[in-house]
Amino acid sequence: MKREKYWWKQYLIKDKNIIRPLDGYEYFLTASYLTATDIFPKFDTEDFYKCAKNNLPQIDIFNYQIKFIEEYPFWYNKKLELIKNINFFEINNLEERDYKEYLSKEKCCKRISDNLDPEDRSIKLSYRFEICQINNKQTMVIMTAIHATSDGRTLFNIFDYVRKIIDFIIKNKDNNNLINNEIFLEKKEAKICSFGQYDNYINLDKKAYEKIPDKWLEVPLMKIIPDLDIDEKIDKDKIYYITQHYRFNYKKIKNFCKKNKVSVQSMLITMLSRATRKYYNLPEETPIYNYTPCDSRQSNLANEYLKNRVFFCGAGALFPKSIGQGDLLKDLQYNYNSIKECIPKLENIIQIMRSSLQIDKETLELNPETKMPNFSTQACTCSSNIGKVNGNLPAFSICMDINKENAKKDYIVCFDSIYTENDLVIMALRPNFINKEYYQIIIDEMNNIFNL
């Protein structure tokens, strides 16, 4: 049944905390969460709880939750509350007693769909914090944020405010009154853009994104992920995504990239394209594309608001083409140039805008016909170099649920990287029943490339 036009506006009148419905770009970002993790000198969990509860609401982005009205998500203004065992946890039963060991182990993607406000279960809380004493000298912090509030790059801007909380309580560990009562973070506004994302850009021609980009139409229909190693009788609840982290020497990688005119992103693309050709015994000339998030804030079409925005999700996808050159270094250089060729064509802006069109503003009805390349049925891999972040040994993860009804064929494999001055950490997201031979070929290519 078709809804009446602007049926939802009545709710905005009734509740002033409702900001607006999520548009098509934001809508699908409510189904996944991003996680920033790092290790710190030992601090008291209760000190963090009290100090964060007072200070993080100073930063507007922490006060945006998601409220469902007639099953549709809306941006909702509600002050961040750290509710123990709802969105704040102290972990005492971690098996690993070393942070580096923890990163290297397989970790189940935690379902946090039950991260609901106990006072109003129509509100999904956007943030979750987990504190774990790894050993007598270190404390691990895991911050999880709903994807609509951040992309991989802006997630660590948000996490930097958590670092400020930790720095403060470590510095003032003997002053309980200060930790419990001091509000030291200055207010930081986070303005939600208008529905549809269009107002974020200057001189954006609507014709540019109303038609399907030629590059998307180039991606061939060719399944390049093997079926999961499961049979039809398996308990579907036993199928889920797992993450694992791999650590490399960034200084060596940086020197290699500079010397050979390549990039970390081209290394990720090369790793996946070479592994795919090797597993399927494909000819070198077989084109394989990569879903490559690219920061829209750097576009020459971005307005001042978007250029200066430090929160929310603003990454749109490029789809650089990879063709094997018969030589590893030549592959890296080819893929580096392929990425550069995509950027001036504004493909990332087009992907954002086409995604935003998936929701009708008047009725909020769904029309998911973006025609964006599909990871399960087309020759398209997925990887992203998020870039440099602050931290001691930070790590990035994605949390999402798998399509349990068609998990055998419909899933994603994704590799994302972040780096500091010394370390580059790659996260691998894949299903727990992934074909072991296929995955091992990817890891072998990764080790071969990132240990150059």
State what each model feature region is.
Residues 1-75, 81, 95-126, 254, ...:
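Acyl-thioester-dependent acyl-group transfer interface
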Residues 2-23, 149, 153-156, 161-252, ...:
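Non-catalytic, low-complexity flexible loops and terminal extensions
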Residues 44, 151-155, 264-265:
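Hydrophobic (often cysteine-bearing) scaffold residues that line and stabilize catalytic clefts
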Residues 77-91:
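Structured interaction and signal-relay segments at domain junctions
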Residues 247-263:
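Surface-exposed, Lys/Arg-rich phosphate-binding patches that contact polyanionic backbones
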Residues 264-273:
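Short amphipathic alpha-helical segments
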